[in-house]
Amino acid sequence: MSVACVLKRKAVLWQDSFSPHLKQHAQDTANPNMPVVLTSGTGSQAQPQPAANQALAAGTHSSPVPGSIGVAGRSQDDAMVDYFFQRQHGEQLGGGGSGGGGYNNSKHRWPTGDNIHAEHQVRSMDELNHDFQALALEGRAMGEQLLPGKKFWESDDSSKDGPKGIFLGDQWRDSAWGTSDHSVSQPIMVQRRPGQGFHVNSEVNSVLSPRSESGGLGVSMVEYVLSSSPGDSCLRKGGFGPRDAENDENDKGDKKNKGTFDGDKLGDLKEEGDVMDKTNGLPVQNGIDTDVKDFSRTPGNCQNSASEVDLLGPNQNGSEGLAQLASTNGAKPVEDFSNIESQSVPLDPMEHVGMEPLQFDYSGTQVPVDSAAATVGLFDYNSQQQLFQRPNALAVQQLTAAQQQQYALAAAHQPHIAGLAPAAFVPNPYIISAAPPGTDPYAAGLAAAATLGPAVVPHQYYGVTPWGVYPASLFQQQAAAAAAATNSANQQTTQQTQQGQQQVLRGGASQRPLTPNQNQQGQQTDPLVAAAAVNSALAFGQGLAAGMPGYPVLAPAAYYDQTGALVVNAGARNGLGAPVRLVAPAPVIISSSAAQAAVAAAAASANGAAGGLAGTTNGPFRPLGTQQPQPQPQQQPTNNLASSSFYGNNSLSSNSQSSSLFSQGSAQPANTSLGFGSSSSLGATLGSALGGFGTAVANSNTGSGSRRDSLTGSSDLYKRTSSSLTPIGHSFYNGLGFSSSPGPVGMPLPSQGPGHSQTPPPSLSSHGSSSSLNLGGLTNGSGRYISAAPGAEAKYRSASSASSLFSPSSTLFPSSRLRYGMSDVMPSGRSRLLEDFRNNRYPNLQLREIAGHIMEFSQDQHGSRFIQLKLERATPAERQLVFNEILQAAYQLMVDVFGNYVIQKFFEFGSLEQKLALAERIRGHVLSLALQMYGCRVIQKALEFIPPDQQVINEMVRELDGHVLKCVKDQNGNHVVQKCIECVQPQSLQFIIDAFKGQVFALSTHPYGCRVIQRILEHCLPEQTLPILEELHQHTEQLVQDQYGNYVIQHVLEHGRPEDKSKIVAEIRGNVLVLSQHKFASNVVEKCVTHASRTERAMLIDEVCTMNDGPHSALYTMMKDQYANYVVQKMIDVAEPAQRKIVMHKIRPHIATLRKYTYGKHILAKLEKYYMKNGVDLGPICGPPNGII
């Protein structure tokens, strides 16, 4: 096995070259699984203590002085590194690619899975993998990437072959782990070689960590500490004492490339902004103070400044330092961390990265992790939360760093799990189904999602919080691996503890984001750590190793080859194996009430472990208490190692084999966890039950529970209440409660406060049916993408928490079409269902399929039209379905620009009961609705389609009493009054007639009032219209010349009684010539000629023919007039033959002149038509040439 040489910083232990006897001594002095802690000085010595603490003391908190370690410079031969690499059994010569090359060639700190093994011979495959990376870094220097043992520092001239940073290229010029574009001060992403972890001839789950014992830890230590240290500059500096800045003047340029941290260089840096801003050749972007800015991010850099050591004290071991830095249970006030900004604490003597601790706003009291003996927390967060309780604003760079802390957390312990062959594990931690090579990766994911559960995103696509990448086969792998590994796991407990402690990413009293369990490390909870390591390996199989309680990592067993085909578990492959942390480092809390309700609902709807929701101990969900659980005493991890909790924060007793997702407090029995028993099928469990992995919990305001609310930003739209959890299994998303993502790629937006955590977005398919792999989106049964947008749980935050974990039908499998919720809000504000409908993704959508969305559809232009069309042909049951949803919010729809049409359709096609129910909703709001643009239409429809004998109609109309004139003069209300006059029995409208008394002339000249007067004249009783007509006759002369009043007079002439017509004609007589030339009155004269009696008509025509207008007759004047010519035309049409002949003879002398006038031509055209039709010969129409008659 690999032997880690963990070095204390008290003495120079390695000479300028590799010493074979020293290496041999390291092998001889340690067990195969124990790290060789070589130390001298007053620090914590390598005593025969539990190996985990041994590694912790040496690798976590020891603070080597500048120059104490890392003597070997660039002059060191790479073959020496390979010589050390050969210490790993089953490892090829170039295996250093996992240890040295893993760091050296890994250009990304993202979980890209590239350049992690020694198999760099296939360059095209390496480049292909990098092309898959969404965050592919440019400037790749393949020639240097292929070096299995790349050094980080150059003692000699760096111009010999360019910068020697592992991120070869202009992206990070000199730094071993330089700042990336996306993240500053990220934890190193120690990536695993699939040849070591997933494939045959190798040890299981070999993921390298800077302080992990196995999987090439010794290789990484030797590679980065010995052969990559700044060589002679380290030897120049001794002890913890500060060194003069003058010593650095000569190699000040080198320091920028070396990225070393020199104790006194702090003084220079504070004066020298040039150096202060350059940590590894690039500016430090995370706002770290000058002391921290010079903090080298190079994992091989073992030099910590005296200022770093002083934080812990020269003689303080790592565990004590951690306890001092962060109180054991996270209760240390934030004030104790005030110096974090200006001081840096050694996180790992092998690796120093100056970085602000992430500020995940976890409450002051951290819930202890599940006892590693009983449940291995895939998300075991010990009470190390205070490291994330920084008040500083959380930067995106720091967030990314925290997201990648898990990458080094991989399989240091894995080779020690009984040395299980990969066959002992379910080989596919990603939900990339074991499809043959050449299969489309996304199509291959369909079957996997159907059987293994949530659709996942291959980690190459998203290096930040791999959304949806959950170990679907978590419990299945656990079952398979537990039996095979029980004996060996017991045997490996001690070693496992050591490696588990070592591989904590940056364990120790560092001020950088730490694994939340390092406090437990300080508390000497080695057996728990060992159990966590063993159980995690058992649970995750070869690719899922969360060796330390803390970040879950998910390493893929499949990759894409050069052709883009999916290769599953097909041997060691270059570019694969980067362990992926699944969720941000915090327990996901489920409120106890919601969890208990879900337990009850599950028990009612499922049958035992196979049914899926019995309160078994092996449950994927576990309610989380908000009290501060007390840390459990150490437990021997050899009792039950088959448990693996997703979000374990419970110290379970060693006899509880709970496989839970959400563990409650230590006092909570394990059998209260929700979910499936160990014998249940995880395909259905993870497919439907685990849809809401990141379901944020409502108890965001509790002072003690760990805070997991992913939406605690300032946006009210995305704020959750603190009352309840989104009920898992309500009627949307097939009963899966999803929480939204705080940022674009799982990162908090810059505007979001420190309270933001990283809840993965719901990229899980909730179907047991086919579901393609998708990037952060949900898919419904037909494979369509259904993205759960922010605020997806808003609708159901106050819903009953007793809902089933699954859909209301209590079935594990959803219906053919996904049930959308109103909470599935898109950025446009529309739900995903409506958005899909608007985009024609549902051409055959039915009313029953939009249940729960009727209100939203009704208020959308296209959705409203859809409902209107469906309602016309809907069955009574379908209409009732729609009606039930709109009734409570009927008024809201009545005043909506599109919703009012849906209400109107119900008045048209609904049953009488539905119409009356809606009418009751109108009652009390008739006036406001009548004056509203859309509400007035609804009232008109109600008045039109509700039988007039219904009492509700009369009651509605009476609400207008006292407001008649206001409504009549309103552009909307006048339509309501007109409809009332048309549809309501006249006896009920007397209040309208009364309101018009004395106002007839004013209303008749009003643009809206004139319409109401006409309706009254049409529909009201004679006794009701008489007073109106009386007022009209008194003002006929004015009304006929009014732009609106003339319509009232015309209406009387058309529909009025003969006596009323005669009165009007009498007013016109004697004024025909004048009124005929009036724009408005000419219309009245036309109507008089048309509707008057024969005698009256003859009198009017004669008046025109006999009257003279100056030298010409009135007829000639009228024929030339733009308005009066229409009166003449009408007279010709309606005159009796004898009178028409007279008119013709009167017109004939003016024919030649009429041709000069535009309007006169109308008269001539009328005459020609008439005479041609009747064959009457009046002689030549054309006059003499001179136009004189």
Swiss-Prot record:
Polar residues composition-biased segments: 512-525
GO BP: adult locomotory behavior; miRNA processing; mRNA destabilization; positive regulation of miRNA-mediated gene silencing; post-transcriptional gene silencing; regulation of cell cycle; regulation of mRNA stability; regulation of translation
Listed GO CC annotations: cytoplasm; cytosol; P-body
Ranges where the record places region Non-specific-nucleotide binding in RNA target: 974-978
UniProt region (Adenine-nucleotide binding in RNA target), positions on chain: 864-868, 936-940, 1010-1014
Purpose: Sequence-specific RNA-binding protein that acts as a post-transcriptional repressor by binding the 3'-UTR of mRNA targets. Binds to an RNA consensus sequence, the Pumilio Response Element (PRE), 5'-UGUANAUA-3', that is related to the Nanos Response Element (NRE). Mediates post-transcriptional repression of transcripts via different mechanisms: acts via direct recruitment of the CCR4-POP2-NOT deadenylase leading to translational inhibition and mRNA degradation. Also mediates deadenylation-independent repression by promoting accessibility of miRNAs.
Pumilio repeats: 849-884, 885-920, 921-958, 959-994, 995-1030, 1031-1066, 1067-1102, 1106-1145
Region described as Uracil-nucleotide binding in RNA target: spans on this chain: 900-904, 1046-1050, 1125-1129
Region feature Disordered, mapped onto this chain: 24-65, 233-288, 491-525, 614-652, 743-774
Annotated PANTHER family: PUMILIO HOMOLOG 1, RNA BINDING PROTEIN PUMILIO-RELATED
Tissue expression profile of the protein: Detected in embryonic male and female gonads, heart, liver and muscle. Detected in adult brain, testis, ovary, heart, lung, spleen, kidney and muscle.
Entry keyword set: Cytoplasm, Repeat, RNA-binding, Translation regulation
Family annotation (CDD domains): Pumilio (cd07920)
Biased composition range(s): Low complexity: 45-58, 491-503, 627-652, 764-774
Annotated region (Guanine-nucleotide binding in RNA target), positions in chain: 1082-1086, 1083-1086
Protein name stated in the entry: Pumilio homolog 1
Record note on domains: The pumilio repeats mediate the association with RNA by packing together to form a right-handed superhelix that approximates a half donut. RNA-binding occurs on the concave side of the surface. PUM1 is composed of 8 pumilio repeats of 36 residues; each repeat binds a single nucleotide in its RNA target. Residues at positions 12 and 16 of the pumilio repeat bind each RNA base via hydrogen bonding or van der Waals contacts with the Watson-Crick edge, while the amino acid at position 13 makes a stacking interaction.
A molecular-function term among this protein's GO annotations: mRNA 3'-UTR binding
Localization of this protein: Cytoplasm; Cytoplasm, P-body; Cytoplasmic granule
Residue ranges, compositional bias (Basic and acidic residues): 250-277
Database matches in Pfam families: PUF
Limits of the PUM-HD domain: 829-1171
